[in-house]
Amino acid sequence: MLYPALLCAALLLIAPLGHTEGRTLHPSPDAIQFVEQFLDRYNDLTLDDLENLVSSQPEEPSSAFTSGVKVAEYPKWADIPAQGDSTWLRLLKGTLANQKRAVMDRSRRGWNRGCFGLKLDRIGSMSGLGC
């Protein structure tokens, strides 16, 4: 009775050792190059710098900063519109503004309101079971 159970357990343990092939993801060298160029160009900008870049940018998209990846390389379901640098600048500007707003909100809310938060501290003070 013990041998069939051991045999089944051994087969279950050996079964995953068969021919299993996983697909690993390798980043594209073009994508890595694009991210490096992007970070080199926009890494040290402040919100004021971004506003100046957006206001001084011409209407036609600049061809100086291209990723080197052609749209035809993407699958058909990936609908990638052609975007200029102004879209990236607006995105970065919005991100910086949101970070500033989050810091101001955090200081205004005052996260440090006792041991367990405002509601539980109020309940604890009414019942006499505070921390």
From Swiss-Prot:
GO BP: cGMP biosynthetic process; receptor guanylyl cyclase signaling pathway; vasodilation
Positions of the pro-segment in this chain: 23-109
GO molecular function list: hormone activity
GO cellular component, one term: extracellular region
Keyword RNA-binding among UniProt keywords: no
Known function: Exhibits natriuretic and vasodepressant activity. Has a cGMP-stimulating activity.
Protein name, as recorded: C-type natriuretic peptide 1
Organism: Oncorhynchus mykiss
Gene that this sequence comes from: cnp-1
